[in-house]
Amino acid sequence: MVGKIAPIAVDAMGGDHAPGAIVQGAVNAARKGLPVVLVGPEARVREELARHRAASSLPLEVHPATEVVEMHDHPGQAMRRKKDNSIRVCFELVASGRAAGMVSAGNSGAVMAGAILVLGRPEGVERPAIVSVLPALKGAPLMLDMGAVVDCRPIHLVQFALMGEVYSRRVHGVARPRVAILSNGEEDTKGTDLTRAAAAALRRAPIDFVGYCEGRDLLTGEVDVIVTDGFTGNVALKTMEGTAKVVGEYLKRALRSTTVSKIGGLLSKAALEGMKKRIDWREVGGAPLVGVNGVGFISHGRSDALAVENAIRRAGDAARTHFIDEIARAVAPSHALLEVPADGAAAEQGPTPRRTAPRQT
């Protein structure tokens, strides 16, 4: 996407490979014209920057933060007691307008706590959510929540759907996102009290709600926004990550098993590399937060330079759309949607039937 924005603030001390991989990713992004401000202990960050040739000529600056949130720190306490920590300072730069967004591969709970504490929430938003972009067969479907709210109420799922629809439309450019709730079946009788209440409300929402989707639908790309509670979403995401890793290992072993398979592997190298890139979590870079007054991305703790660079790029893309301006308007009717009519008809009808072609068997 085009258009100049303020720098993206990057937590230089977050993640297993900080500050080396974080600084490398920031340098790579800056070399592609993306303005970046690295936040962390100034001497240490500048020492790492000195390893990179001509870094001083890049759109890259350093902003000091004297404290670091460790992975074992309690998120809320760390935000309040370590007031000059790199995560909080990143959010302060966003809140002041000196940064267009922030990226951190550090303590995800601390990132969420910092976002709420420093940025606050748009009017009407009950709880923010973490969004994941799935490596589907087509499109770039979103799933939320991925762990911010593990014990959800119907209002949370309804607002996740409305916020996810805005993000899909404004940031990913989907003209009319198809929204579904993750469940254990497509039938009206499936799901839980939580999902049925949320589905009944979303039937009345001004979005393209298509009802329930199942776990097998996550990577097909048939829907654009998949809504679930944070516990289920986090388990689903890590299951997909683990499955991709195991399938990749099976494939490598199979291609090395015989001379013929090795030749076949060489002939298929380009296709295999394309597939590998498609499912590589580093290509996504990070998970955006929705429901806070600013752009924030949580990157994987194992992020390397490629993941950090992509997270910076995606944060910049999100900031350019100003999608946050629409969040408050989107969630405004959420409580009214949950008000069941006197005859109870909406609640009894359950989710809207899926508007997709019948599955071939």
UniProtKB/Swiss-Prot annotation:
Annotated spans, Disordered: 342-361
Gene Ontology biological process terms in this record: fatty acid biosynthetic process; phospholipid biosynthetic process
Entry EC no(s): 2.3.1.274
This protein's GO CC annotations: cytoplasm
Main location: cytoplasm
UniProt entry keywords in alphabetical sequence: Cytoplasm, Lipid biosynthesis, Lipid metabolism, Phospholipid biosynthesis, Phospholipid metabolism, Transferase
Catalyzed reaction equations: a fatty acyl-[ACP] + phosphate = an acyl phosphate + holo-[ACP]
Entry's Gene Ontology molecular function annotations: phosphate:acyl-[acyl carrier protein] acyltransferase activity
Pfam entry (one): FA_synthesis
Localization (cell): Cytoplasm
Pathways per UniProt: Lipid metabolism; phospholipid metabolism
Function: Catalyzes the reversible formation of acyl-phosphate (acyl-PO(4)) from acyl-[acyl-carrier-protein] (acyl-ACP). This enzyme utilizes acyl-ACP as fatty acyl donor, but not acyl-CoA.
Assembly information from the UniProt record: Homodimer. Probably interacts with PlsY.
Family per similarity comment: Belongs to the PlsX family.
Family annotation (HAMAP family): PlsX (MF_00019)
PANTHER family xrefs: FATTY ACID/PHOSPHOLIPID SYNTHESIS PROTEIN PLSX (PTHR30100), PHOSPHATE ACYLTRANSFERASE (PTHR30100:SF1)
Name used for this protein in its record: Phosphate acyltransferase
